[in-house]
Regions:
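Juxtamembrane intracellular "pre-TM" segments in multi-pass secondary transporters
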Residues: 1-38, 63
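Extracytoplasmic gate region of multi-pass secondary transporters
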Residues: 30-89, 145-146, 150, 177-185
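Cytoplasmic membrane-interface "Motif A"-like loop-to-helix N-cap segments
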Residues: 94-109
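Paired intracellular helix-loop junctions of major facilitator superfamily
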Residues: 98, 152-162
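A membrane-interface helix-boundary motif in multi-pass transporters
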Residues: 100-103, 184-214
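C-terminal ends and interior cores of transmembrane alpha-helices
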Residues: 110-124
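Multi-pass alpha-helical transporter architecture, strongest
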Residues: 119-123, 208-230
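A late C-terminal transmembrane helix in Major Facilitator Superfamily
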Residues: 159-192
Length: 230
């Protein structure tokens, strides 16, 4: 007959020396400046990512005069392109750059900055320009999520502590995303005026907050350009 399916497998237990090495590697991750710098870079990238995801439709309506339908469609482009960027991030680094993450991280970090500048600094309704900006933004963010949010940290962390490295970067990233929502809300509401019974928003500070975050993400990524595994 068939072998029993409910027989539990023996769990492999680590020896005392293996446990000591594992714990040492976990602590080593927390003392690696490169991991924390990558975490900062990813956090600032997440600020720009969730700024557009959370506030992009409102921005297009209030600042540029788009309808809700058109604004939603334009922002949705970035999500689709983000999937494409994530899918091809490994091919980009392995095939085009010989496994190096720093060069594509710089290229797509600058792509993210360019996309935000096109999106935020060109006034008025320019449907195709804003659509192109969201294509660039989505591709850039999709690649950066893989590199800044994971692969670059795993590459330089001890092999038996890659999970800890991902944890540090992931926590920092979502802290950045959460702070972004609070800061963006404060800046938008704090620069609202009423003119002839109509709410008017000054997005100047929002523009520089979002673009500045993308620039800082690139800046911190450059700090770990030559970081190696310990």
């Amino acid at each position: 007959g068939f072998p029993p399916v409910n027989v539990s497998k023996e769990k492999k237990t680590m020896s005392a020396s293996e446990t000591a090495d594992f714990n040492k590697a976990q602590r080593q991750v927390l003392t690696m400046p490169a991991i924390w710098i990558l975490a900062l870079s990813s956090a600032f990238m997440y600020i720009s990512r969730y700024a557009v995801n959370s506030w992009g439709v409102f921005y297009l309506e209030a600042q540029k005069g788009y309808s809700t339908l058109d604004a939603s469609f334009i922002i949705s482009i970035s999500s689709v392109c983000g999937i494409i960027g994530t899918m091809f991030s490994g091919v980009i680094s392995d095939k085009l750059f010989g496994g190096r993450r720093n060069v594509p991280a710089l290229i797509f970090g600058l792509t993210n900055v360019l996309a935000l500048c096109l999106f935020l600094l060109v006034p008025g309704v320019h449907f195709w320009l804003d659509a192109v900006a969201m294509i660039l933004f989505g591709l850039g963010i999709g690649v950066l999520i893989c590199f800044l949010g994971g692969l670059m940290a795993v590459d330089i962390a001890p092999r038996n502590a890659s999970g800890a490295a991902l944890g540090v970067v992931g926590i920092a990233s979502y802290i950045g995303a959460g702070l972004q929502d609070v800061m963006s809300g404060v800046l938008i509401e704090g620069h609202k005026t009423i003119r002839n019974g109509v709410e008017v928003y000054d997005f100047t500070y929002i523009n520089w907050f979002w673009i500045g975050s993308a620039i800082l993400s690139v800046f911190f990524a450059l700090w770990v350009w030559n970081a190696k595994q310990k």
